Every structure is written in C-alpha cells, then in structure tokens.
C-alpha cells in the first residue's frame, strides 16, 4: 500500500500514472461513484480493487466498514474472491479524427441535452445497420452496468461473467422497445444526427463531452477490472 501526504485532501486524487508499479491492491473508500472513478483511473492495469462502502449507494461496494479489517486480512492472505468485470472503451470520432477516448465500468450513454427534443441516433453493430433510434438517448452497458441506468430504461440484467454488451434505448418513440444484447466481441457505432450540440456523451454518469451532428461514438469491450 502506498499513501502519499500530498494527495490527502486533493480534489483530483491520484493520477493513473502515479499509481506505483507493483501495487497489488487498491482500497476504494466511498460509494459506487467512487468505485467507478477508481476503475477508470486504473483501467488496463491488473490491480484488484477492494471497495468499501462509505457512501449512500453500495450496490458495487459490498464490503461494509465493519467488515473492512476481516475482509482486508483475507485479501492480503490471498483468500479473498476476486471477480473479473469487463470494461468498455469508447471513442468520439469527428471528421475522421478521434477527439475523445474513454473507459467505462458501467456504461457509455449518448443522450439529449436538457433543452433538446428527441434525437436521432443511427446505430451499427460490426458495421451492420441495426436501427435509427428516435429517442432521448442510447445506453451501451457492460454486464456490470446492466443493473444501473440500463435497468431503469427497461434493459435486461446480465450476470457479470456473461460475455456481452447491452444496447438499451431511452424513451424511444416506438410502440415496442426492445434492448439488444450483442457479443462482447462486437464493435458498436452510434452516429448522432442531432443538430448543433443537442447530444451529449456521458461515461459512467460522471464525465463526458458534447457531440455535434455526424459525430461517431465507437464502443467496444476493453480491459478486465478485478474487484473483491
């Protein structure tokens, strides 16, 4: 474990490149939002996360404060169960150039801005046209994220070990709303047809950027995250 005084009280926390080589465990103190931020911070590095729930919502952070020391002792002794969870990689492509790159544990969402009406989102899976959704947005979620925003929008619950990605429309203007589950080897492409900056990309509900018309959001499975 490495604790540096200069990060105590820092609003920016610990940068990914500052996590020392050889780190064997990252203890996350907080709620699910803290865990999501930590997952993105160490994405691509095979360092298990040890999440302890100090927040209000602890769906992913199942270890309570009372369980901290007994569970931590098990983890240090190598007796703790480690669960692999697949993450998502998303890119924003504008005029043929990548202008944004993100990692997500839960989901990548293309949605409307506050004052926008429904937006049109052309959707492709492995270069094959699926549909143009006229909706408030589109959620691309991992199995972990299937119990988050996607569930609220009527998406299915996927077991964390399932090798799949879920595509869930948000309030689509249609008589039937059916989420689509595709293999995690698929490449999903969403083309925003919303004029101006009426569409917005959100990653794990925490970070994102505005999209302009004809921006392409390309999503695929990326690295594994390991949690206790």
Model region roles, listed by residue range:
Residues 1-5, 226-227:
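Conserved small/polar residues in nucleotide/adenosyl-binding loops
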Residues 4-44:
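N-terminal glycine-/serine-/threonine-rich phosphate-binding loop
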Residues 8-13, 122-124, 170-173:
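Short gly/ser/thr-rich secondary-structure transition/capping motifs
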Residues 32-34, 57, 144-146:
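Short glycine-rich anion-binding loops that position phosphate/pyrophosphate groups of nucleotides
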Residues 37, 41-59:
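Gly/Ser-rich helix-loop-strand patches that form or flank binding pockets
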Residues 57-136:
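Catalytic core of DAGKc-family lipid kinases
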Residues 110, 126-129, 178-228:
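ATP/nucleoside-binding phosphotransfer catalytic cores, i.e., glycine-rich phosphate-binding loops
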Residues 132-136, 140-176:
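Gly/Ser/Thr-rich active-site loops/lids in small-molecule metabolic enzymes
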């Amino acid at each position: 474990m490495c604790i540096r005084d200069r990060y105590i009280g820092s609003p920016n926390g610990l940068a990914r490149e500052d996590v020392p080589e050889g780190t064997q465990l990252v203890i996350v103190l907080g709620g699910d939002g803290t865990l999501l931020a930590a997952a993105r911070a160490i994405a691509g590095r095979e360092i298990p996360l040890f999440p302890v729930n100090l927040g209000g919502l602890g769906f992913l952070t199942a270890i309570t404060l009372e369980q901290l020391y007994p569970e931590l002792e098990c983890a240090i002794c190598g007796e703790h169960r480690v669960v692999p969870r697949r993450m998502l990689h998303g890119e924003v492509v504008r005029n043929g150039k990548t202008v944004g790159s993100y990692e997500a544990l839960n989901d990548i969402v293309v949605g409307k801005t506050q004052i926008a009406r429904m937006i049109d989102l052309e959707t492709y899976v492995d270069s094959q046209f699926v549909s143009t959704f006229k909706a408030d947005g589109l959620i691309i979620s991992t199995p972990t994220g299937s119990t988050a925003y996607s569930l609220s929008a009527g998406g299915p619950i996927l077991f964390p070990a399932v090798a799949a990605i879920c595509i869930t429309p948000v309030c689509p203007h249609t008589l039937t709303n059916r989420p689509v589950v595709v293999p995690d080897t698929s490449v999903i492409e969403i083309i925003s047809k919303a004029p101006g900056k009426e569409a917005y990309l959100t990653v794990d509900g925490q970070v994102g950027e505005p999209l302009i018309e004809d921006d392409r959001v390309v999503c695929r499975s990326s690295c594994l995250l390991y949690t206790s």
